[in-house]
Amino acid sequence: MIERWLYSTNAKDIAVLYFIFAIFCGMAGTAMSLIIRLELAAPGNQVLSGNHQLFNVLVVGHAVLIIFFLVMPALIGGFGNYMLPLLIGASDMSFARLNNISFWCLPPALVCLVTSTLVESGAGTGWTVYPPLSSIQAHSGPSVDLAIFALHLTSISSLLGAINFIVTTLNMRTNGMTMHRLPLFVWSIFITAFLLLLSLPVLSAGVTMLLLDRNFNTSFFEVAGGGDPVLYQHLFWFFGHPEVYILIIPGFGIISHIVSTYSKKPVFGEVSMVYAMASIGLLGFLVWSHHMYIVGLDADTRAYFTSATMIIAIPTGIKIFSWLATIYGGSIRLAVPMLYAIAFLFLFTIGGLTGVALANASLDVAFHDTYYVVGHFHYVLSMGAIFSLFAGYYYWSPQILGLYYNEKLAQIQFWLIFVGANVIFLPMHFLGVNGMPRRIPDYPDAFAGWNYVASIGSIIAVFSLFLFIYILYDQLVNGLENKVNNKSVIYNKGPDFVESNQIFATNKIKSSSIEFLLTSPPAVHTFNTPAVQS
């Protein structure tokens, strides 16, 4: 047991560890968001007894837990580690032991984060950790230092993982698997790994300077010593903007597979999809200052960042329309993964549209730090990254676990979270247009109506998550066994396959990617002899 799970060098076992960790942290992060919404359900003090510092600590905890401890471990560490070697026909990840330490950096990081909330009065800085609020004058205890250590540990984890994914993809593809034949999910993880590799060192530099400012009397961000807090913002957002693409691009890969499978068609414009993802990744590094329109940038700088930000809409639009073209004329089956994929397309597009409004420097002066921004990025993250997470789970878990989930319960869970998430985040745009500021635990009575609606929505969404945990339990305990490989023919809940640009065939089934040709669940060691493309 200890040998298998603690010292594991098996990508599949490490992926399972990532999933368990991510589910645990996701529940904690969701609990924090529920407390935030309960506090904001009505004007005045509701649940936090006027402790406004605690409110901000919850905001930090919610953000960091969900970004660094749920979405990245699940999409990249979980699906990436499990599916990428299967999809390229590799026996494991290139650096198997490095993979192990990538995971085991995360539990200590979680310990640091939790500890930071328990000492003094916690780190109430917002997830951006801007000085001077995060400096030693405003946050005197070790809270912020512990939060910085947590970020360092997650950065190490992600960096090592990124190196591992890049080397594995370049060196361990099976015979006949050229780069142009890689499945889209592999491409998405590959591109994400490059984004991590280039952006995380900048974050680490920024928070290390903050650590030195706080403890060793340097003045990187200390105006009295000739420093500038705006430097920190540049460093943070040079990481922070690629980070949001790191969160969503693996989701793009998952959605591509699902849309293709349940439309019984190859993805429309597969190579264009790869170039679109790569363009999004590259452009993501050229737009960071659109988070900083109000710090006093020159007019020409603002003009550039406005234009560059809008250009990202082009490759994103290519992806959306290619997915629609894949669905169009297909033989669509609305299984749960497909429901999530279609919801993803609709809601991600809405999130993108509100983003176009925020891209304008002049408009953003009004929108900055209001709930309009919160509504925008939760549409693209909550209904982009999290929906693709659920979609990937419902798509691949019967193959990974060898057990089916209850389709009817899963559909109910989808509709609950679909309704809940929209009821939470749509009203936030209305609040933001009317000027309700972010990160504030109380508000004038005029904002009460929509805040109450949003809080009702969060209760619906939390119910859907409880239902998901039950579905998971039911699948593991009572799930129907996935005995044979031609299940997609005899059992209507499995995916339908179709001839794609590349065909992997056994005598039972043809598939557009390798993973469904293996036994279910896959053997502990797959591809000891290389898979050869037919």
Curated annotation (Swiss-Prot):
Q: Which pathway does the UniProt entry assign to this protein?
A: Energy metabolism; oxidative phosphorylation
Amino acids binding O2: 245
Where is the chain membrane-spanning?
A: 16-36, 57-77, 101-121, 147-167, 182-202, 235-255, 267-287, 310-330, 338-358, 372-392, 412-432, 452-472
Q: Which CDD domains match?
A: Cyt_c_Oxidase_I
Gene Ontology molecular-function annotations: cytochrome-c oxidase activity; heme binding; metal ion binding
EC class (word): translocase
Per its record, the protein catalyses:
4 Fe(II)-[cytochrome c] + O2 + 8 H(+)(in) = 4 Fe(III)-[cytochrome c] + 2 H2O + 4 H(+)(out)
Q: Which residues bind Mg(2+)?
A: 368-369
Cofactor binding mode and count: Binds 2 heme A groups non-covalently per subunit.
As cofactor, the record names: heme; Cu cation
State where it is primarily located.
mitochondrion
Where are the residues linked by the 1'-histidyl-3'-tyrosine (His-Tyr) cross-link?
Answer: 241-245
Topology in the lipid bilayer is annotated as: Multi-pass membrane protein
Question: Which cell locations does it reside in?
Answer: Mitochondrion inner membrane
Query: What UniProt keywords are attached to this protein's entry?
Result: Calcium, Copper, Electron transport, Heme, Iron, Magnesium, Membrane, Metal-binding, Mitochondrion, Mitochondrion inner membrane, Respiratory chain, Translocase, Transmembrane, Transmembrane helix, Transport
Q: Which residues bind Ca(2+)?
A: 39, 42, 44, 441
Q: Which Pfam families match?
A: COX1 (PF00115)
| One GO term of the biological process aspect | electron transport coupled proton transport
**Binding, heme a3:** 376
The record's Gene Ontology cellular component field reads: mitochondrial inner membrane; respiratory chain complex IV
Give the PANTHER family listed for this entry. Answer: CYTOCHROME C OXIDASE SUBUNIT 1 (PTHR10422:SF18)
By sequence similarity, the record places it as follows: Belongs to the heme-copper respiratory oxidase family.
* Subunit and interaction comment: Component of the cytochrome c oxidase (complex IV, CIV), a multisubunit enzyme composed of a catalytic core of 3 subunits and several supernumerary subunits. The complex exists as a monomer or a dimer and forms supercomplexes (SCs) in the inner mitochondrial membrane with ubiquinol-cytochrome c oxidoreductase (cytochrome b-c1 complex, complex III, CIII).
Question: What is the official name of this protein in its record?
Answer: Cytochrome c oxidase subunit 1
